[in-house]
Amino acid sequence: MSDPKANRMVSPERRSDDVGDTALRPQSLSDFVGQQQARKNLSIFIEAARKRGEALDHVLFVGPPGLGKTTLAQIVAKELGVGFRATSGPVIAKAGDLAALLTNLEERDVLFIDEIHRLSPAVEEVLYPAMEDFQLDLIIGEGPAARSVKIELSKFTLVGATTRAGLLTNPLRDRFGIPVRLNFYTIEELESIVSRGARVLNVGMSADGANEIARRARGTPRIAGRLLRRVRDFASAADADTIDRKIADHALSALEVDAAGLDAMDRRYLTTIAMNYGGGPVGVETMAAALSEPRDAIEDIIEPYLIQCGYLQRTPRGRLLTSHAFRHLGLAEPNRDAAQFGLFGTDESDD
């Protein structure tokens, strides 16, 4: 069974070939494009903390992958003029790992924990007093000889990032004084990101070329940067000094990313429902078997963007294609009564 996100050009998750995207990242809030209200608020909080000479309150970035949570965390540290340490939830396996990180922080430093929702309960218990009182409560030894030790910590800022806020425990979520939700980017914002990236990569970019890449980037800067690097390769091979709409369209079509940002896997999913199941409804387990993909991959990787774009509905009776999907596929929409759309369905099992 294939990993459905391993080779997808439009996967918002970080890929092994994304090492070049660090050069495209903005280095300050003023360079950062999009998330206007979040940037404005962060700028005020950072300036206030700087003026008081205090550590910034703990920050939680919430949003889909690829929207700039890690970049913003690095910018926060730079704007504060303090040290930056980065790790992720799965890496902190035990309380001792967290203690080692916290005790090495200097005053007002930023500790960034990506995928913070994946911290173990034991590690979270150690994190609570560290965030609230800047103290570590550790148990040294075992059995009758065990004793509790309190360690004073430097006042630091914890910046957490999560794609799944619902998996955070309430005690952890409540300890973040500055929650920041990141949203998908507009085409105009992505055009600015693509144009800036082209300047960083020293490649010419026309306005219509930037628009073509932005329209297919699924509202996600990481995808926009990845598409830009691949389109640049096509332009270099063709000895083109400037990426225009024609070059961008040729390159992205060769990469099987269509005008709506859908790739071969998206189209295969939609076409299977349209051709094999009359547009639905069809259960997710049936689709998993038909596509030879695990259920969680379909629910977490394939479906979210299709639902966001209005191509797919999740109904009590199963997955259902919309009229928009049939138009995109160039197929005639079958006659379907209202019950098929789940308006009167009561069966919540969905396979």
From Swiss-Prot:
- Spell out the residue ranges making up region: Large ATPase domain (RuvB-L): 2-185
Question: Is Repeat there in the keyword field?
Answer: no
Q: Which GO terms describe its cellular component?
A: cytoplasm; Holliday junction resolvase complex
The record's listing under InterPro entries reads:
AAA+_ATPase (IPR003593), AAA_lid_4 (IPR041445), DNA_helicase_Holl-junc_RuvB (IPR004605), P-loop_NTPase (IPR027417), RuvB-like_N (IPR008824), RuvB_C (IPR008823), WH-like_DNA-bd_sf (IPR036388), WH_DNA-bd_sf (IPR036390)
- The UniProt annotation places ATP binding at L24, R25, G66, K69, T70, T71, E132, D133, F134, R175, Y185, R222
> Where does the record place the region Small ATPAse domain (RuvB-S)?
186-256
Q: Which residues bind Mg(2+)?
A: T70
The UniProt keyword set, sorted, is: ATP-binding, Cytoplasm, DNA damage, DNA recombination, DNA repair, DNA-binding, Hydrolase, Nucleotide-binding
CDD domains, alphabetized: AAA
Which GO annotations describe the biological process of this protein? DNA recombination; DNA repair
Note the Pfam families from the entry. AAA_lid_4, RuvB_C, RuvB_N
| Residue segments, region Head domain (RuvB-H) | 259-351
The domain-related comment in the record is:
Has 3 domains, the large (RuvB-L) and small ATPase (RuvB-S) domains and the C-terminal head (RuvB-H) domain. The head domain binds DNA, while the ATPase domains jointly bind ATP, ADP or are empty depending on the state of the subunit in the translocation cycle. During a single DNA translocation step the structure of each domain remains the same, but their relative positions change.
Q: Which family does it belong to?
A: Belongs to the RuvB family.
Task: Quote the subunit structure annotation.
Answer: Homohexamer. Forms an RuvA(8)-RuvB(12)-Holliday junction (HJ) complex. HJ DNA is sandwiched between 2 RuvA tetramers; dsDNA enters through RuvA and exits via RuvB. An RuvB hexamer assembles on each DNA strand where it exits the tetramer. Each RuvB hexamer is contacted by two RuvA subunits (via domain III) on 2 adjacent RuvB subunits; this complex drives branch migration. In the full resolvosome a probable DNA-RuvA(4)-RuvB(12)-RuvC(2) complex forms which resolves the HJ.
Role, per record: The RuvA-RuvB-RuvC complex processes Holliday junction (HJ) DNA during genetic recombination and DNA repair, while the RuvA-RuvB complex plays an important role in the rescue of blocked DNA replication forks via replication fork reversal (RFR). RuvA specifically binds to HJ cruciform DNA, conferring on it an open structure. The RuvB hexamer acts as an ATP-dependent pump, pulling dsDNA into and through the RuvAB complex. RuvB forms 2 homohexamers on either side of HJ DNA bound by 1 or 2 RuvA tetramers; 4 subunits per hexamer contact DNA at a time.
Check the record and name the HAMAP family matching this protein. DNA_HJ_migration_RuvB
**The protein, known as:** Holliday junction branch migration complex subunit RuvB
